[in-house]
Amino acid sequence: MLGHFKKRGESWYFWVELERGADGKRHQLSRGGFRTRKQAEKAYAEVRDQLRQDSFITPTKTTVGAFLVDEWLPAVRASIRPGTHDHYSKMVHGYVVPRIGGLKLGDLTPGQLNAFYADLLVDGRLHRGPSQPAGLSPKTVRHVHTLLHKALADAVRWGNLGRNPADRAEPPRPRTAEMKVWDLTQLRRFLTRVETNRLGPIWLLMATTGMRRGEVLGLRWADVDLDGGRISVVQTHVLVDRLVIVSEPKTAKGRRSIALDPTTVSALRQYRRLQREERLRYGELWTDTGLVATREDGTAINPRLFSAWFTQHARAADLPLIRLHDLRHSYATAALSAGIPAKVVSERLGHANIAITLDTYSHVLPNMQEQAAEQVAQLILGS
């Protein structure tokens, strides 16, 4: 079983003659897209060994697009959060299918994936604003790679592929962006601005707990214990195809209990009284959702609209514009800077593990080291 190698353009490929099939015809197996002959030889050796061990999987004629849309997306729907499935679907239909969806799944190579990623970096943006570049960011392209790697790994597990071409692909490394947060003075200015706003207590809740947008919008009064000063995060609101749906928290640790400070408890009591007055005023037009954060008629607040309101308040307060999610980062940065143990901050944020907290907010750690050095020295030296 001799392999033949040849360079075509900038890539190497190999082919091997197979035994005659049931139709009596000779068949040929080929693979391409390798950057070096050595890579092609290694891939050939794997195919040769699989053929000898009778473990070779005949390449499927299914296209990449058909596999992702007709098989993979429906199969994983039940095992992932609705918001995640919606995100996957948008990436598949927006980025993958239009560019490499017509390629045969079994013929997909690392080289083709690398070319696909390069194409997205140059001209991948679907909806381009006046000041936006045509290409996607390295971070977004890497998200596409992560999706493809997972989908192709499932294809291998299900017997559609012999190996995962994404294992050897080289997605771009995302640039480390500087985290945008408000300092304590800016946080106070924002809270002063929204203090008289109808949703002022909700903004205060976000600022003093670091809860995610979906967690706050999905919070029910049944999950709030004002007497005990605690709330339980058991569900979240996500936007899927312009519809607000109820989902599980983002991670297992996302299902958690959060202690509230007296000021936030007092603000929520006042807000609940306001909501009850609105219920009486609207009468039969009131919608009893049981939610804490609602519109005046009791209905749920659209997450995108909630973010837009946040931006409006930030502009009105003449504050640096940050995303609503950065309010969560601002809380975490303030808490860590104040010397709150990272484990406690991680638990309040609902991170899957403390390593995520330490990695995300590593910019705060040097100052914490200095504070620790001074405090320990004062304890030991008594000065």
Question: Model-derived features: where do they sit?
Answer:
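Short amphipathic beta-strand and strand-loop transition segments with alternating hydrophobic
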Residues: 2-7
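N-terminal DNA-binding module of tyrosine recombinases/phage integrases
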Residues: 8-13, 17-115, 271-292, 296-299, ...
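Short functional hotspots where side chains directly engage DNA or cofactors
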Residues: 104, 166-168, 228-233, 323, ...
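Basic, Lys/Arg- and aromatic-enriched nucleic-acid-binding interface segment
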Residues: 126-146, 157-221, 226-227, 238-239, ...
